[in-house]
Amino acid sequence: MEPFQSNWQTGVTEQRPELFLLSGKEWSDGISAGFTGRRGGISKAPYDSFNLAYHVEDQPEDVLENRRLLCQQLGFDPKGWVCGEQVHSNHIACVTAEDSGKGWADRASAFQDTDGLITNVPGILLTSFYADCVPLYFIDPVRRVVGLAHAGWKGTVADIAGEMIRTMERQYGSQAADLRAAIGPSIGMGQYEVDERVMEHVDVWTGRLEGNGQVPTYAKSGAPGKTWLDLKQLNRELMIFAGIQPQHIEVSQWCTHERHDLFFSYRADGGRTGRMASWAGIETE
């Protein structure tokens, strides 16, 4: 079953944008987590219409209103919004109550050089932004900790998935065996062709990850020197390598490139487009 379920059937409007809600008991028991679509919101083309990121050339006031609409729909106070200035790294920030609002109104106030966020504070809404890259979600249902990570190919081969797990263990006392994880909508292997330069970094992991899963991490394409890369599966294998049980990982089948009617896609939209947001937060009582 697809873990990210659209709220489209409940009616999507400018004021009530489309959300893809992460389902499952662990993700619904006082935890809000999911992924935004591109429908709804107020941004104009080519960012139409639910763009959540400032770093594209969208009007800042439209982005801010879209963020307000998301918080309103989720029931989170905008003052609890937190995001990072993503740089395709494996850098992670542990978010406290004092960090509330970082990145809400501008890029300068966000966590700089950061692609992973973790918190155990109710009312904090962790967010990160995408247009083909892979959103990673983590929850420790025992210690009530949530985390998000942004994984492009650079962050993936830098093992941001493993770094998230190790940081949760080190900073929050989590145990990998307790963790649940999800991999959200992103570009699928059949649409993500990379060159030998990228595969040199991927191949460093290949031998170490053998036997983790039954789905190949990548397969050769017909073009010389090119490979179709499955970033979702590679991140899944990295999670397993770091200690998460395979049955505790859910993987979305949504491909942002194939369904760029529903999602922003950097490759399908020619590079000039908006960004979806992943989110995760512990709800206040």
Feature annotation, model-predicted:
Residues 1-285:
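Active-site microenvironment for binding and transforming phosphate-containing groups
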